[in-house]
Amino acid sequence: MATGAPGGNFRTWTPTPPERGSFPLDHDGECKEYMTKYLTCMKFTENKNAPNCRILAKQYLKCRMDNQLMEKSDWDSLGLVNLPGENDVELDHHHHLNNNNTKADGKSGSSNSNQNLANTTNNNTGTSSGTK
């Protein structure tokens, strides 16, 4: 691509690719659930880098890597290693969030996922659950 410059000088401009390659859009919505939960967490914590949001970010990136929507990368290079509370929430083979905090009867400890998000966020950021 050529660009015009004053005086009739033409220079060729060559675009440079992103450092980690291209990131295809998720047209089929394969990772939309993770993206939505991560963005909700970020909104709730006022865009602070809370540990529970980092866990959701890791799950979102794992989904993107598993579905070839981004290149596979090690967690250390992404800064997502040994996150606190990471073992409480895992990713199953069908890319759905599983909460390992279940009762003996197989039911979850809480029926409201937003309340779980709020409690986790408040525990990790030191705020009280009645504020906001």
Curated annotation (Swiss-Prot):
Disulfide bond residue pairs: 31-63, 41-53
Domain CHCH: start-end pairs: 28-71
Cellular component aspect of the GO annotation: mitochondrial intermembrane space
Keywords: Cytoplasm, Disulfide bond, Mitochondrion
PROSITE patterns, alphabetized: CHCH (PS51808)
Cx9C motif 2, short sequence motif: residues: 53-63
Domain of life where this protein originates: Eukaryota
Residue numbers spanned by region Disordered: 1-22, 83-132
Location within or outside the cell: Cytoplasm; Mitochondrion intermembrane space
A Gene Ontology biological process term: mitochondrial cytochrome c oxidase assembly
Biased composition, class Low complexity, residue ranges: 110-132
Motif Cx9C motif 1, residue numbers: 31-41
Matching InterPro entries: COX19 (IPR051383)
PANTHER family: CYTOCHROME C OXIDASE ASSEMBLY PROTEIN COX19
Function: Required for the assembly of mitochondrial cytochrome c oxidase.
Family: Belongs to the COX19 family.
Protein name, as recorded: Cytochrome c oxidase assembly protein COX19
Provenance organism: Candida albicans (strain SC5314 / ATCC MYA-2876) (Yeast)
Lineage of source species: Eukaryota, Fungi, Dikarya, Ascomycota, Saccharomycotina
Name of the gene this protein is made from: COX19
